[in-house]
């Protein structure tokens, strides 16, 4: 089998294609969630706590000296990324919960009695009838 034919078969397997689609959709979903957090959630939240832009939260570890730039820890961006993560994790949790519900197997109905059980039941019933009719 040629290398390219083998690769094509590998790439066209259902699970590989599904994974690729999932990665692409996940990347797009990540952008949507980032925009939701940055543009929709954080501005009102910042307004509620005093008109603060979370992106501006930073701690200067060392100020700029001459040509040496300042060393700054931007913890506001980190807070925003934590919000991103929580929303994405919650959405994935909900999606997995729905998928698990859809894939949940319905309990099988109990099978009826086997042929042997039916036959033995009939024999038992016949023996009971015969014993009832005896004096």
Curated annotation (Swiss-Prot):
Keyword Lyase recorded: no
Lineage summary: Bacteria, Pseudomonadati, Pseudomonadota, Gammaproteobacteria, Enterobacterales
Annotated protein name in UniProt: Large-conductance mechanosensitive channel
GO cellular component entries: plasma membrane
Main location as per UniProt: membrane
Quaternary structure note: Homopentamer.
SUPFAM superfamilies (UniProt xref): Gated mechanosensitive channel
Topology of this chain in the membrane: Multi-pass membrane protein
Record-annotated membrane-spanning stretches: 10-30, 76-96
The keyword Nucleotide-binding is assigned to this record: no
